[in-house]
């Protein structure tokens, strides 16, 4: 089915991105014979259409920066793919889809080193700007703690549409594969993420970010919990 034929309300929703479609099709190709692939992809498309028809309509469409590559609607498409193909796709393959959407932008920023005060402060300003955008749409409710030179950067989301969608439609079990990319993205900036909870299994998603040479990292070792989330003690 052509993307243009999908019956979604484009006045408030957006289509999954082209890179997201490419990643999903690659996984379908990996697991299904050629004669079945088109049918499987159409099932994913129809599931996407169906669930969006039952989903909130206030996320800003194309105007909201959270709805681009790797954002809210791509996460929804990935969950729809998981729903159709959960019997064959692995957890690691689900992680790879989100990584391949998010990490290319961070790889271009390898020169950034959060151990250095200049870059750390610049990152804080970027998060503060993101909070202003979130305040416009009230999709991801974001709160950034005031900057302190001697402490890690801290912010949190107390609302996350992707987590809300997962819990509403029964995809909470695969959310770790989508959330773990936050760790990988920070590592490309010589930074470390320290996290203890998410909006899926708690009331907030916390982000404590410091340089990868900061002693704070050793004080909060990382582990994977029983659900697959990367977390810290």
Predicted regions: what they are:
Residues 141-201:
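Short, hydrophobic/π-rich interface segment
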Residues 206-208, 219, 225:
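N-terminal functional module detector in eukaryotic proteins
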């Amino acid at each position: 089915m052509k993307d243009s034929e999908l019956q979604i309300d484009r006045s408030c929703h957006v289509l999954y991105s082209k890179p997201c479609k490419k990643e999903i099709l690659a996984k379908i190709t990996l697991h299904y014979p050629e004669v079945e692939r088109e049918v499987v992809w159409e099932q994913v498309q129809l599931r996407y259409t169906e669930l969006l028809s039952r989903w909130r309509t206030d996320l800003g469409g194309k105007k909201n920066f959270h709805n681009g590559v790797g954002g809210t609607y791509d996460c929804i498409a990935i969950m729809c793919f998981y729903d159709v193909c959960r019997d064959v796709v692995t957890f690691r393959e689900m992680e790879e889809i989100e990584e391949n959407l998010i990490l290319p932008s961070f790889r271009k920023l390898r020169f950034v080193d959060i151990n250095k005060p200049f870059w750390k402060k610049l990152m804080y300003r970027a998060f503060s700007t993101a909070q202003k955008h979130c305040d416009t749409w009230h999709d991801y409710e974001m709160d950034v703690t005031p900057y302190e030179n001697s402490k890690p950067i801290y912010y949190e989301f107390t609302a996350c549409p992707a987590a809300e969608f997962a819990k509403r439609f029964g995809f909470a079990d695969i959310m770790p594969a989508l959330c773990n990319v936050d760790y990988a993205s920070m590592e490309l900036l010589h930074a470390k993420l320290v996290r203890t909870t998410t909006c899926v299994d708690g009331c907030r998603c916390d982000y404590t970010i410091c340089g990868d040479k900061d002693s704070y990292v050793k004080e909060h070792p990382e582990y994977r919990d029983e659900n697959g989330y990367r977390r810290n003690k």
